[in-house]
């Protein structure tokens, strides 16, 4: 299966903390991206891994770097030209446990669309039907540009798919809550809290 790790965000809240981009945080001797790529190959021998980034210095064994053609809005992390059938979007600023990656790989193809995460954060989107996901993505993007909604993220795509209010954090059909540990790093506080919990 094709896995696209989204690592082309602005990182404004992270603000180059410790002189690093979020994706270059090292935990247990490897960066977040190195860990995710390694685990994907461990649990899916046929994994094709793509990392979306304009950083020409980014080279991770086992992954190909791709420069998105359009990265204006936050929703554009879902690189439109890479959306297709039988694929998965993952987040480059997330620490994935082995169990989380195993859950993602094992649920490939289970539903037309399957969002995976906690009650607070989406950590993966499994796509069996690329045309459906692209339609939802384009609808949310258009609604945001027209001023009909105030946020334009993965949550809005999920809520449109599930028939839930677009401004909520409700969870319904097509969402798998994983108890497996994942942690996203949006700010220095996120990182420091995680490290303090490891000691």
Write out the residue ranges for each language-model feature.
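N-terminal nucleotide-binding beta1-loop-alpha1 segment
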Residues: 1-18
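Hydrophobic targeting segments
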Residues: 2-5, 33, 48-49
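Short, polar loop motifs at secondary-structure junctions
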Residues: 10, 50-58
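Short alpha-helical oligomerization interface
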Residues: 18-24
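A short, N-terminal amphipathic alpha-helix
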Residues: 30-46
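Short phosphate-binding loop-to-helix
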Residues: 56-90, 95-99, 103
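Conserved core of the sugar-phosphate nucleotidyltransferase
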Residues: 96-180
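C-terminal catalytic/acceptor-binding lobe
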Residues: 174-199
